[in-house]
Amino acid sequence: MLELLVALLALALAYFALLDGWYLVRVPCAVLRARLLQPRVRDLLAEQSYAGRVLPSDLDLLLHMNNARYLREADVARIAHLTRCGVLEALRALGARAVLAASCARYRRSLRLFEPFEVRTRLLGWDDRAFYVEARFISLRDGFVCALLRSRQHVLGTSPERVVQHLCKRRVEPPELPADLQHWIAYNEASSQLLRAESGLHDILKEQ
């Protein structure tokens, strides 16, 4: 019995030492909770909330939530959001998937140890290649927006328009994207062109 306990302890230590253990547990739990315990969200543009609290494992050396943790929490909240509104299910039905192609973050105020917060996620819109998602970190102490994250979910294997049409059973015009988001999209495109030029891909693509 003791040997079994030691083996299980060693296995648990190896799991958390070699893998991102809590993340690999939380994501499936978030998906199952969104599917089984929460109601389906029919409005693609509706805001959804995901509750959290700053834990000791989230802290940096200044005892604030580590900047990288915001990206992780936004990732979990985004997966739950896309599950509840049916986007992930539609992607699977179409044999497609969405990958994170770009993100940006604004940090406005630190979240401190044990501070409760909400990640409010919403779909801002889409174009011919990607969905654009926003996540706001709201302190539940005073309602302040502590951080704002935007992400570009690039769709592979189909188009965002087909995903939305699959969900809504009709063609839906995408909403107009906010001006600041349009500037960010333009920045990403300019950055992509610059990187292609640096690697020689720009000339290759033009020849093709």
Curated annotation (Swiss-Prot):
It holds the Pfam family 4HBT_2. Residues 1-21 form the signal peptide. InterPro entries: HotDog_dom_sf, THEM6_lcsJ_thioesterase. Keywords: Phosphoprotein, Secreted, Signal. It is found in: Secreted. GO terms for cellular component: extracellular region. It comes from the Eukaryota. Belongs to the THEM6 family. The modification Phosphoserine is found at S199. CDD domains: 4HBT. SUPFAM superfamilies: Thioesterase/thiol ester dehydrase-isomerase. This is Protein THEM6.
